[in-house]
């Protein structure tokens, strides 16, 4: 994935003593200089799949950013598509998949090591000699948007946060009659919202719980026609954020963003860089 303007490295990062790992493509500006470049961590959307079209956001590195686009399951993105499909069928089952794995105990929930891994990724990025020593941005959409906010809530080193229609937000809202909860919509899965331990875990790992801790300037976007991550759940996050914040609401959008919106996010980060 190297070009005449950027360099790319595939990184496998061990995130804990248990052996959990995350893979990611690390993009550098060509001839990156020591102490000169802001870093951007980009977590993935939901699912068990490869890292989608790594060069689609090459303009970050072309504009001077070091960008680390990750997956969260410890699966080499070079594996064949068929392998990812088989793994997904085997482990991402019809009762919530990995997002329901271990919900009965918040200390054993699958997303625990994922959330911790975000901090480990920031450890890695801030250890790079080319990092400018000041700017750590997080950026993502859907599950990636959720993880961007979680990272900003967990780690005070984050200086800019950008999230599209964050998933994992207001997940237990379905417990109250007439309310819509966030992705992955646990009302569809047998018994989860009738289990008090599961509800406690959902509240603990909910993006809203981390949004209250975010200090970095935050740019949040969502669409009114999104049935995957309903706009009410993005409002729950927005209303909880107490940091400097800016929003982009797109009434026509479903669960997608335009290339213009994606590019504007990078421009927003540039505008908010610490000089």
Which residue ranges define each predicted feature?
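C-terminal catalytic histidine-bearing segment of alpha/beta-hydrolase fold enzymes
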Residues: 235-275
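Short beta-strand/loop motif that positions the catalytic acidic residue
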Residues: 214, 220-222
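Acidic catalytic loop of the alpha/beta-hydrolase fold
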Residues: 224-229, 255-256
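N-terminal cap/lid segment of alpha/beta-hydrolase-fold proteins
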Residues: 1-35
């Amino acid at each position: 994935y190297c070009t005449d303007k950027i360099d790319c490295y595939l990184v496998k990062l061990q995130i804990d003593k248990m052996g959990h790992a995350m893979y990611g493509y690390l993009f550098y500006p060509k001839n990156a200089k020591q102490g000169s470049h802001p870093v951007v961590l980009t977590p993935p959307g939901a699912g068990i799949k490869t890292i989608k079209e790594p060069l689609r956001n090459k303009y970050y590195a072309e504009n001077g950013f070091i960008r680390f686009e990750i997956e969260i399951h410890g699966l080499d993105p070079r594996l064949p598509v068929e392998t990812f499909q088989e793994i997904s069928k085997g482990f991402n089952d019809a009762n919530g998949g990995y997002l329901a794995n271990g919900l009965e105990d918040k200390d054993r929930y699958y997303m625990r090591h994922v959330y911790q891994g975000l901090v480990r990724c920031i450890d890695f990025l801030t250890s790079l000699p080319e990092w400018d020593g000041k700017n750590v941005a997080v950026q993502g959409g859907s599950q990636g948007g959720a993880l961007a906010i979680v990272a900003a809530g967990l780690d005070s080193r984050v200086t800019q946060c950008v999230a599209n229609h964050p998933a994992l937000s207001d997940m237990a809202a379905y417990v109250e009659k007439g309310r819509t909860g966030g992705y992955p919509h646990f009302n569809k899965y047998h018994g989860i919202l009738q289990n008090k331990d599961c509800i406690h875990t959902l509240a603990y790992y909910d993006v809203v719980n981390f949004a209250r801790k975010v200090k970095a300037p935050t740019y949040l976007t969502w669409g009114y026609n999104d049935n995957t991550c309903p706009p009410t759940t993005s409002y729950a996050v927005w209303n909880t954020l107490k940091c400097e914040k800016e929003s982009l609401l797109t009434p026509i959008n479903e669960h997608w963003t335009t290339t213009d919106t994606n590019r504007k996010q990078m421009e927003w980060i540039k505008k908010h860089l610490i000089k």
